[in-house]
């Protein structure tokens, strides 16, 4: 990286202000003049770096009333992350009826929780002017989808998205929750970083299909959480196998055990396998998640097992 480019990045461009980048006088080619400029640039660069480093990372602040935060993430879209988040929340409650569970949708551009949890309407405000989550199937839910029209696209820049995330994190009255499941957007961008740096997260669950292209991005997602000191609880291998409803023959449409190979590479465990099954898709589209509507099915049992593994790892993780 050249000197002038470094100065533009660290010295001249800042959301919080700062001096403009120094530009050498036109036609100035004298060696002494150049050395003076380089010396000035070097000193300005050092000062700017010191200013940036002194700010540090945002101080993490727990969400009031929430004991454990579990984020459900994926490296890419279309792997069943939101379906996993919804059914994980329901499974956590089903496995232990004494536990209060919430579900937070921070996928601002593509919120899925309202549809999957069969919820509509706007949140009411508490006396403290905080939004109250909408409730269904015993799960308290909050999503940007409750605040905008279902078909209205959000054409927002990054700062507006970050402001919305801040409101979803800090301006919701959750009451007392044992578990808050957070449905992340796909990828490893601003939202993931902002959430990870602003609230204490008990653990991350990475969702992937067994195919190589999805596993590549899942690898990146797991590494990102490790870099921001978020414990990765394990991987969920979604759409692991398809069983023909007539002949019962099993086919690994997306490949076999790809997530297990990745888990070995990352020194992680696979929390469970979820089959590719029509009932999961139909139940989600109807707003009746399979853990609620078909609790005795093999599909629901897969999510119940995953929830048990998540809780076991939370209990064994250091405080």
From Swiss-Prot:
Q: Which Pfam families match?
A: ParA (PF10609)
Q: Which GO terms describe its cellular component?
A: mitochondrion; plasma membrane
Keyword Lyase in the entry? The reply is no
PROSITE patterns on file: MRP
Q: Per the entry, which co-factors are needed?
A: [4Fe-4S] cluster
Keywords, sorted A to Z? 4Fe-4S, ATP-binding, Iron, Iron-sulfur, Metal-binding, Mitochondrion, Nucleotide-binding, Transit peptide
Q: Name one GO molecular function term.
A: ATP-dependent FeS chaperone activity
GO BP of this protein: iron-sulfur cluster assembly; mitochondrial respiratory chain complex I assembly
Quote the record's binding site residues for ATP.
Answer: 75-82
Gene3D superfamilies, per database record:
P-loop containing nucleotide triphosphate hydrolases
Q: Where in the cell is it found?
A: Mitochondrion
Question: How is the co-factor bound, per the entry?
Answer: Binds 1 [4Fe-4S] cluster.
Q: Where is the transit peptide?
A: 1-38
The UniProt entry lists the main location of this chain as mitochondrion
Q: Which family does it belong to?
A: Belongs to the Mrp/NBP35 ATP-binding proteins family.
**What's this chain's function?**
Iron-sulfur cluster transfer protein involved in the assembly of the mitochondrial membrane respiratory chain NADH dehydrogenase (Complex I). May deliver one or more Fe-S clusters to complex I subunits.
- Please state what the protein is called: Iron-sulfur cluster transfer protein NUBPL
Which organism was this protein described from? Mus musculus (Mouse)
């Amino acid at each position: 990286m050249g000197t002038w480019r470094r100065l533009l990045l660290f010295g001249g461009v800042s959301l919080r202000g700062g001096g403009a980048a120094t530009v050498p006088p036109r036609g100035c080619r004298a060696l002494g003049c150049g050395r003076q400029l380089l010396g000035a640039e070097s000193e300005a660069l050092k000062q700017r770096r010191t200013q940036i480093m002194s700010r540090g990372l945002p101080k993490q602040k727990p969400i009031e009333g929430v004991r454990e935060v579990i984020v459900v993430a994926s490296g890419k879209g279309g792997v069943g992350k939101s379906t996993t988040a919804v059914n994980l929340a329901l499974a956590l409650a089903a496995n232990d009826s004494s536990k209060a569970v919430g579900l937070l949708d921070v996928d601002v551009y593509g919120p899925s929780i309202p549809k999957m949890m069969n919820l509509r309407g706007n949140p009411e405000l508490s006396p403290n002017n905080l939004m109250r989550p909408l409730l269904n199937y015993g799960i308290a839910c909050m999503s940007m989808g409750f605040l905008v029209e279902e078909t209205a696209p959000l054409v927002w820049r990054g700062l507006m998205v970050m402001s919305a995330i801040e409101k979803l994190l800090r301006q919701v009255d959750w009451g007392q929750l044992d578990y808050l499941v957070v449905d992340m957007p796909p990828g490893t961008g601003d939202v993931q970083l902002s959430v990870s740096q602003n609230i204490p997260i008990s653990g991350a669950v990475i969702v992937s299909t067994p195919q190589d292209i999805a596993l590549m991005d899942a690898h990146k997602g797991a590494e990102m959480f490790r870099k921001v000191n978020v414990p990765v609880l394990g991987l969920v291998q979604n759409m692991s196998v398809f069983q023909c409803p007539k002949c019962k023959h099993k086919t690994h449409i997306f490949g076999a055990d790809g997530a297990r190979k990745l888990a070995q590479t990352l020194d992680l465990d696979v929390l469970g396998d979820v089959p590719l099954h029509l009932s999961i898709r139909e139940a989600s589209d109807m707003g009746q998640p399979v853990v609620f509507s078909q609790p005795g099915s093999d599909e629901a049992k897969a999510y119940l097992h995953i929830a048990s593994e998540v809780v076991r790892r939370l209990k064994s993780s250091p405080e």
